[in-house]
Design a protein with these regions (language model features):
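Conformationally flexible catalytic loops at phosphate/diphosphate-handling active centers
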Residues: 1-74
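Anionic-ligand anchoring segments at beta-strand to alpha-helix junctions in alpha/beta enzyme folds, i.e.
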Residues: 64, 79, 83-114, 226-256
Length: 256
């Protein structure tokens, strides 16, 4: 079904630009300082056009598959004041935690980044609830020596000069595949509720050296009744990871 979204004419035109001895061209030459800057900036128009193009195709994919995708997707209470901004697989854990907290009367949310570069302020603001007052940005990376991690700095820059901008703090999670659990996500939301939320924090570890970690909460399960959970132990290169991946695919393909 997705094949129809690809223009064969445009694809052929793109492939025709590949290097070929039948149509020799010179590429990669050095440019002098008198023109390099101008040439580098000339590509802005192409980057600026990407978000709208991606949004359009995401809309078409949604129509075909029924799965909704946008450059930024929001999940949670429509009038939430405290939200998390994150991207990647951790957002699934965050969404389930939001449902758990909603059952307890908590109004929180998550703004999921699907198109990171080029970063679109227009689509971010379109997805952001007007009620938001505090934001915790989660990065799965560490930039030693910087004032913050990449996504956090993007969000801070986004609100530069904006009147009544929400408070923005940042934290790190999941380095080297460290598990990110619902209890840790709850601690992030609880941090936002403080009079002075902690910035430059970590979750998932106990940092007893630089004391940047948020207080660890007792772990709890939010899986639905009837769900089977398994934990497998293996040694390096013994096939455990591959076998489990294949098993998950088989179960997924044969589960209604």
């Amino acid at each position: 079904a997705l094949k129809g979204l690809v223009s064969k004419k445009s694809l052929a035109k793109f492939r025709a630009k590949a290097l070929s001895p039948d149509a020799p061209v010179t590429r990669g030459t050095a440019q002098n300082a008198d023109v390099y800057f101008q040439a580098r900036e000339a590509c802005n128009q192409y980057y600026d056009a990407v978000p709208d193009t991606v949004a359009r195709y995401m809309g078409e994919i949604s129509e075909l598959t029924g799965r909704e995708y946008r450059p930024f997707d929001y999940y949670g209470a429509e009038d939430a004041e405290n939200i998390i901004v994150a991207m990647g697989s951790a957002t699934e854990t965050i969404k389930e935690t939001i449902d758990y907290m909603a059952a307890q009367g908590k109004k929180v949310g998550v703004l999921i980044v699907r198109l990171y570069r080029p970063f679109s302020a227009k689509y971010f603001m379109k997805a952001l609830p007007h009620s938001v007052k505090r934001i915790a940005v989660l990065d799965r990376t560490k930039e030693p020596g910087s004032l913050g991690e990449p996504l956090f700095l993007d969000i801070k820059a986004l609100f530069q000069g904006v009147e009544n901008a929400p408070l923005v703090v940042g934290g790190r999670y999941g380095l080297s595949s460290k598990d990110t659990t619902p209890a840790q996500i709850v601690s992030v939301y609880e941090n936002l509720e403080l009079a002075e939320p902690k910035n430059d924090f970590t979750i998932g570890i106990v940092d007893d050296v630089t004391f940047k970690s948020l207080p660890q909460k007792e772990e709890f399960s939010i899986v639905k009744p009837g769900t089977t959970e398994c934990k497998f132990f293996g040694l390096g290169s013994d096939g455990t990871v591959g076998a489990n991946k294949n098993t998950i695919k088989i179960i997924g393909d044969n589960t209604p």
